[in-house]
């Protein structure tokens, strides 16, 4: 987006700091799994948020990012988020929206936090960040996480190459300009890291690019549970026989998707978790699994329209890769690194804050080249 839409404040930020060619999301390239990977240094298959929605066998519950009670329930979250690590070592933290920051358990939350509300204006968030930075030293957070949902919304609704997305990127660029001006006005030595949880892949809304859930599996079968994530469909079976028969049916009609049994998941996904489906239907890039029937889709869908999606395997689809830019007193100006997986952001932040690392998937050496003492 920065190069495509010529975003001046982002370009200045990059020129004054370090950058990666790309930030590779962890599988699946979805919002909740990757936000939580960024702050835990663990892949989704290890931290437990395996998708934006999933079924949890142990508790016989379904987690969904739109279900407040589940989002705030620490049961679903493993790992040690950066704010929890900070708290364990007497360092204050704050968050203006981040996945995992709203848990009911105070010991696992930032010292200052907000419940997610997508209507809060960017200016309001920036003003709060600056007021946190202006707190007296004993109360001041040394770690702040901040989330902006634009241009993600526009990318989804109009596709990554649309005028609407361009306008949203330029609005985000203005927000970055204001944020950096305000941070500089505090005269504090602040390191700023800009990341995205994923990129965006353009699809065309057509019956030909749609996989209909009810044509893939028997949704009336009580011995099968499923959770559809659009790019992936998780299928949970009551027993091994049911799994094998379901798999055979899916394998026979395999077209525009790949079907995997759990033990067949590519090793690079590191996706062996109780909460992933016994069977996973992985839509091929450009295709999308929908819950509606073909009939309803053809009646209501904006056929031919461009949309943006993510969730595909980042190894196979470079478009779903994200950004990593950083600047500040602990960042080498002008440093460039090749594409790297987002599990490696956590150890850099921990090093800047001088916090010891818990057991994680990320490795400190990946970004040590951009670190300045």
Language-model features, listed with the residues they occupy:
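Active-site-proximal N-terminal segment of extracellular/periplasmic enzymes that hydrolyze or transfer
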Residues: 1-18
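Short, solvent-exposed turn/loop segments enriched in Gly/Ser/Thr/Pro and often Arg
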Residues: 21-39, 97-103, 363-367
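Acidic/histidine-rich catalytic neighborhood
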Residues: 189-190, 198-238
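His/Asp/Glu-rich, glycine-adjacent segments
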Residues: 41-159, 255
């Amino acid at each position: 987006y920065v190069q495509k839409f010529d975003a001046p404040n982002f370009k200045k930020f990059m020129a004054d700091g370090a950058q990666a060619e790309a930030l590779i999301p962890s599988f699946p390239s979805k919002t909740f799994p990757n936000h939580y990977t960024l702050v835990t240094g663990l892949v989704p298959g290890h931290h437990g948020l395996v998708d934006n929605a999933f079924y949890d066998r142990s508790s016989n519950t379904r987690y969904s990012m739109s279900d407040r009670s589940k989002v705030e329930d620490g049961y679903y979250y493993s790992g040690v988020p950066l704010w929890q690590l900070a708290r364990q070592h007497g360092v204050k933290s704050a968050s203006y929206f981040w996945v995992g920051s709203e848990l009911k358990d105070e010991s696992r939350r930032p010292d200052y936090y907000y419940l997610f509300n997508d209507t809060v204006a960017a200016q309001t968030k920036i003003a709060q960040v600056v007021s946190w930075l202006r707190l007296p030293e004993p109360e001041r957070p040394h770690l702040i996480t901040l989330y902006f949902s634009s241009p993600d919304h526009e990318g989804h609704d109009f596709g990554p190459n649309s005028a609407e997305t361009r306008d949203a990127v330029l609005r985000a660029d203005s927000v970055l300009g204001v944020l950096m001006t305000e941070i500089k006005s505090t005269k504090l030595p602040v390191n700023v890291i800009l990341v995205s949880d994923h990129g965006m892949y353009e699809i065309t809304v057509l019956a030909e690019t749609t996989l209909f859930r009810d044509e893939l599996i028997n949704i009336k079968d009580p011995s099968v549970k499923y959770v559809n994530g659009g790019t992936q469909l998780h299928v949970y079976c009551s027993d091994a026989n049911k799994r094998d028969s379901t798999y055979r049916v899916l394998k026979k009609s395999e077209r525009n998707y790949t079907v995997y049994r759990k033990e067949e998941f590519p090793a690079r996904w590191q996706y062996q978790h109780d909460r992933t489906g016994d069977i996973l239907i992985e839509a091929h890039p450009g295709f999308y699994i929908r819950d509606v029937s073909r009939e309803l889709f053809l009646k209501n869908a904006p056929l031919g329209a461009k949309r943006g999606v993510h969730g595909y395997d980042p190894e196979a689809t470079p478009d779903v890769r994200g950004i990593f830019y950083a600047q500040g007193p602990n960042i080498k100006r002008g440093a460039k690194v090749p594409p790297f997986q987002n599990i490696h952001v956590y150890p850099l932040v921990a090093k800047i804050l001088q916090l010891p690392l818990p057991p994680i998937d990320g490795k400190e050496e990946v970004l040590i080249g951009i670190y300045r003492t």
